[in-house]
Amino acid sequence: MPSNMFIQADKKKRLSLDVIGQLEDDLEADPLDYNKWNKLIQQVLAKDKEEQVKSVFNKYLNIFNFDQWCNYINYQLNRGEFQEVEQLFSKCLPITDHVELCRLYVSYVRRTNDVITGGEKARGIVVQAFEFAVTKVGIDISSGDLWNDYLDFLKAWTPAATWEQQQKTDLIRRVYKRFLVIPTEKIEQVWSTYTKWENEVNASSANKFIAEKSSEFMDARSWNTEWHNATERSLRREVIPIGIHNDNNNLVHTQLQLWYKWIALERENKLNLKDDSSVQQRIEYVYKQAIMALPFVPELWFKFNKFWLRSNEEANSNKCIELLNEALVLNPRSYLLTFQLSEMYEKDNTINKATETYDNLITFLTNDYNNINNQIESITNRELNNKKQEENTGEENNNENDDSDNDDNDDDDSFKNPTFQLSEEDALLLSKLQEKKDELNKAITLVYTKLMMACKRSRGIKEARGVFKQARNNFEAIGYEFYVENALMEYHSDNLKTASKIFELGMKHFKKQGEFLLAYLDFLIMINKGESIKVLFEQGLTALLQDVNIENENSNGDITSGANMRLQESKSKENIKKKNCIKKLIKKFSRYQSVYGDLDLIKSLDSRYEEYFPDDDSIELFSDRYRGHSIDVIKHFDLGKEDTSHEEIDTTAQETKRRKIQNPTVDEFTPEVSNNNNQHTNNKDAVQNQQQPQNFVGNTIYNLLRVLPNSSYFGPPSDHLFNNTKLVELFGNLPNVPTE
């Protein structure tokens, strides 16, 4: 897709009345905005500046090469630019199957070949144009008007001789026979017109000709009824300029299913076509219409490509590559299409093209990542500046206060938050941006990983190492998965030393990433490095525990605003994930020790687990050690619980607790709990909430919790994890405070 599509080298600020300029700027930022393109085209057509119109249409058609051709050609026809028109027809007709475009083409041919002045030669050219058009789009259910145009043209011919009259009759009958077997929208009306015409030509032979086509007509009429039922009379043939992800009204999904029903109907061959190639032609035609109507749905392009490959992979290979390249112009961030095209290039042994396809996707994703990162930095920098201004204002006010107010100021200091406050709107936006950033990070990591694997397959380990180096240089935030996959690739290429070094390199960046530690532990177990396993376990466990402790301490700050509570909720989820990683790490090491270690060490691990997670059921760790690959006998037979050992463990699952206290949900992130909140829950939640005390946390307790010191004040580092017993002891030893 071309960059700098509209921006000039000496670009000036747009005037507020410069609608065209503003639209061009918007399209420079988002070249795939179909609606803005249409507005721009309307604006330039109204201005009627030829060079500007041509420039906009050419840029538009480089992206949407299936749309707006009729509009552009009509503009040139109105100006009498017939040479331009012919060039446009030569560009669009080979790549676009559109009924109205073909009708416009025939209309142009008739305009430039007058049968009155041109005679038989002109008539022959027009007939050829009609034949081209009906061959190209005559099977379309909406092609009835084109066929009728053809018939009307033939019927308007006034023969000069008897043999010409017979030739005219034969031509008309031949067109009718082709027309009547195609299930067009007004097929019954066409049949009625045909039977009337046959009787007018020759009543004695009419029944014979009508009987020959009645069976095929009945099939076509029946198909027409089935088609309307399958598409529920709501199929949209015009462009729907949205994709799956912004399909708020479920329009794309609904239309997609209707197109699939049409394709399924064609596969059933209810028209009883004897030639398989005719069935394939109809299916192909429907796919072409579908991708024109839903151009931003990668799934459709993918299935159309697979259809061509199944039909004749060797013959259609080049067509498939062209199709996927067109699809990626409209869906440049599609993983599905990128991976499919790169595989085709790899199979075709054009490796440079395959890597270029990956690089294009990485470029788009990296730009998105950087844009989101800039937005996050902009919000945080703005809030930091606001905080500094507030602090400066506060210092000025303090200098004006009397010394007698010092005690009151000391009391207020205890309520100050060491971090800046975010507005509700900014906090929500920041949370969404961070989620999107994390998602893009994983996506970029995955694409680099697949590129590395493709290079390993096609060019060997040396080329894959080049990708490993390139990715770390180009995208510093690349995820741990990339290191793990590269290390395993080296290992399976008989490079154990290199694999170990890559894991060691990964430890420098991801020592607090539980998923990386688990993968590294699996690797060490696989290569049977006993001492290294123990060292990694202790290092990883220590790093994760420290990280969790820091998060717990940070969470004890002032969270009086709903905005900060949103951020706190996000951090809490992340903290739960880290705790789950700690559990997995201990369980994995415990299972390893149960096979290759000794019982004393296993018991020591049990004690440490219970110390770190005192609220967890002690049976959980014990039963995990004795579960099989496909069955957990303790959980299933002794505890009577559902056996989930064969299922993948959800790393985001909540912690398993001996008892769970369900606090009522607070909709507006305030400390007060309203009885009205239960109205917004489902029946199950309502029953659960009714069982809990109302107003569980009031303002008094909430304000007390705000000013409590963090966990680091309650003892040595080993006690930094929250201990509810010590909190109860603290409350019990508080002196009685007289109330007024």
Curated annotation (Swiss-Prot):
| Pfam families xrefs | Suf
The ranges of region (Disordered) come to: 381-418, 668-688
Question: What GO MF terms are annotated?
Answer: mRNA binding
Cellular compartments per GO CC:
cytoplasm; nucleus
Q: Where is the composition biased (Polar residues)?
A: 672-688
Where, in residue numbers, are the HAT repeats? 48-78, 80-114, 121-156, 167-200, 236-268, 278-310, 494-526
Q: SUPFAM superfamilies in the record, alphabetically? A: TPR-like (SSF48452)
Q: Does the keyword Repeat apply?
A: yes
Question: According to its UniProt record, where is this protein located?
Answer: Nucleus; Cytoplasm
Keyword entries, A-Z: Cytoplasm, mRNA processing, Nucleus, Repeat
Q: Would you say which domain of life the source belongs to?
A: Eukaryota
For this entry, list what GO says about its biological process: mRNA 3'-end processing
- Primary residence: nucleus
Q: Which InterPro entries match?
A: HAT, Rna14-like, Suf, TPR-like_helical_dom_sf
Q: Does the keyword Kinase apply?
A: no
Give a short account of what the protein does.
Component of the cleavage factor IA (CFIA) complex, which is involved in the endonucleolytic cleavage during polyadenylation-dependent pre-mRNA 3'-end formation.
Name the chain's protein. Answer: mRNA 3'-end-processing protein RNA14
Task: Please tell me the species this chain comes from.
Answer: Debaryomyces hansenii (strain ATCC 36239 / CBS 767 / BCRC 21394 / JCM 1990 / NBRC 0083 / IGC 2968) (Yeast)
